[in-house]
């Protein structure tokens, strides 16, 4: 019995990351999603993957057909109600590091360390007591509750030409960890049966 408990305990310790898996948020970017809405033919999509265990947040954006040239892009948080309204900028200002500026179409892919002050708008950190951990928790809560949106600003629409509220598309699957857990449980059951027999 002791071997069974140890085997299951060991397997659970190896799959701890599966219990705190990265979470993926996605959105469709459009002028109709702005507040107030605009008639821009611009369109795009964004994926934000946040890993609470490593404090890393990957931002992937693709956009095209903007009327104006890009001037900035960032994540705003947290609106009063999910999926509606406006909020201040949560991530770094004036724009994401390396975001393509002065263009009407492009792609972007960057990973931020959310345990660093440089990943945030200082006003967002100040609003959360000056604490990085509280700021990270607030942004994570805003993402999970649908109260955060990614905005692409342009010369024609300084308040934002296209945006979209980020919605949870579920944790990133970690099949290796789950397979290991299944294997350990199978081994534990086999040991238990042999011992009982």
Name each model-derived stretch.
Residues 1-6, 192:
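Bacterial N-terminal signal peptides that target proteins for export
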Residues 21-73, 77-171:
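Metal-centered catalytic cores of metalloenzymes
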Residues 194-197:
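Short, charged juxtamembrane terminal tails flanking transmembrane helices
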Residues 173-191:
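A short, hydrophobic C-terminal helix/tail in secreted or cell-surface proteins
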Residues 7-15:
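Bacterial N-terminal signal peptides
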Residues 12, 29, 178-181:
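Generic leucine side-chain signal with a strong bias for well-ordered alpha-helical environments
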Residues 17-19:
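Bacterial Sec-dependent signal peptides at the C-terminal "C-region" and cleavage site
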């Amino acid at each position: 019995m002791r071997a069974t408990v140890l085997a299951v305990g060991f397997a659970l310790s190896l799959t701890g990351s599966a219990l705190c898996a990265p979470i993926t948020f996605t959105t469709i970017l459009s002028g109709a999603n702005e507040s107030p809405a605009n008639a821009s033919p611009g369109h795009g999509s964004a994926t934000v993957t946040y890993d609470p265990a490593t404090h890393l947040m990957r931002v992937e954006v693709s956009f095209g057909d903007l009327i104006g040239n890009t001037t900035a892009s960032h994540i705003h948080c947290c609106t009063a109600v999910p999926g509606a309204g406006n909020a201040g900028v949560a991530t770094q200002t004036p724009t994401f590091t390396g975001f393509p500026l002065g263009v009407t179409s492009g792609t972007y892919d960057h990973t931020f360390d959310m345990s660093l002050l440089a990943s945030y708008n200082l006003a967002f950190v100040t609003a959360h007591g000056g604490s990085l951990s509280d700021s990270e928790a607030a942004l994570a809560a805003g993402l999970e509750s649908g109260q955060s949106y990614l905005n692409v600003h342009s010369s024609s629409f300084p308040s934002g030409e296209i945006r979209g509220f980020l919605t949870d598309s579920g944790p990133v699957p970690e099949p290796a960890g789950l397979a290991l857990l299944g294997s350990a449980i199978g081994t534990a059951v086999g040991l238990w049966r042999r011992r009982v027999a």
